[in-house]
């Protein structure tokens, strides 16, 4: 009898621990406020009776849509749905500005719990912007992009900038200016990524991670990049290959606009 009781209760204990981890995670300062639905915001619920109501209401809506009972229960479950070494997929119980209870999913970079999740860099060399010719697994295509990457645990923003710049281009950072932050997809991603404008020097060999597919670094003028952005793609010929690369990087588009509006390329060198 005791054996079967342990078998029955053990998954419940594991779920309770996981749910407590979730509640602690969503109240981390860097993930933003819980919100107030009475002020027109989507409010995250942390009291268990309200969370249960949000789950139940969501499950009922799914059942009305014809979703199978087991899936409806699974798809309405609040908490940490999945995680790996890089990401959390979480589902929050919320109350919408309409007063209706429900759930809402978010994807979090784990590095954003203690600070900025990563860094994007607009490196300047001889008044040109250095970009990566990068093959991306997610899009299954060649892309023209700014150098960027995740921030390591306990790493400052400046250290992350210096490391990513060195790894992806081989250059050293001379001086820098924070252009701002970008929300890549505010509908699902919680992470806000800073973009840094910098002058670079002392080129060496790239030291890319084994999982990266950066073919080349290319220095282009602001006008060349604006034209490529308007076209949506460009033909890139390098000593290694000639490819048709897409030009649609949101980090690059944001940086180009900031650089142009601030007239940074015509300004004196940064101090």
Regions found by a protein language model. Name each.
Residues 17-57, 68, 139-142, 153, ...:
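Nudix hydrolase/Nudix homology domain
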Residues 43-87:
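N-terminal positively charged helical leader segments and presequences
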Residues 76-120:
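Acidic, metal-coordinating catalytic segment for phosphate/diphosphate chemistry
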Residues 94-98, 185-205:
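Active-site-adjacent beta-strand/loop module that shapes the phosphate/pyrophosphate-binding cleft
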Residues 131, 145-181, 196, 207-213, ...:
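The catalytic Nudix box helix
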């Amino acid at each position: 009898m005791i054996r079967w009781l342990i078998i029955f209760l053990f998954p419940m204990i594991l779920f309770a621990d996981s749910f407590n981890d979730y509640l602690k995670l969503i109240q981390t300062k860097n993930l933003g406020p819980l919100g107030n639905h009475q002020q027109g915001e989507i409010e995250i619920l942390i009291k268990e009776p309200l969370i249960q109501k949000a789950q139940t209401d969501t499950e009922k809506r799914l059942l009305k849509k014809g979703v199978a009972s087991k899936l409806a229960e699974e798809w309405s479950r609040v908490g940490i749905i999945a995680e790996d070494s890089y990401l959390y997929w979480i589902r929050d119980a919320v109350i919408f500005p309409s007063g209706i209870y429900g759930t809402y999913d978010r994807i979090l970079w784990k590095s954003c719990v203690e600070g900025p999740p990563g860094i994007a860099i607009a490196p300047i060399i001889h008044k040109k912007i250095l970009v990566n010719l990068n093959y991306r697994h997610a899009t299954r295509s060649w892309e023209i992009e700014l150098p960027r990457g995740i921030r390591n645990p306990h790493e400052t923003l400046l250290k992350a900038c210096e490391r990513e710049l060195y790894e992806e281009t081989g250059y050293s950072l001379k001086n820098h200016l924070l252009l701002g932050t970008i929300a890549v997809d505010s509908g699902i991603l919680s992470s806000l990524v800073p973009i840094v404008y910098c002058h670079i020097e002392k080129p060496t060999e790239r030291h890319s991670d084994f999982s990266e597919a950066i073919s080349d670094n290319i220095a282009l003028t602001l006008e060349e990049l604006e034209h490529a952005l308007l076209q949506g793609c460009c033909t890139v010929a390098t000593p290694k290959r000639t490819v048709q690369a897409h030009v649609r990087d949101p980090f690059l588009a944001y940086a180009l606009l900031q650089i142009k509006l601030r007239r940074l390329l015509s300004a004196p060198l940064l101090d």
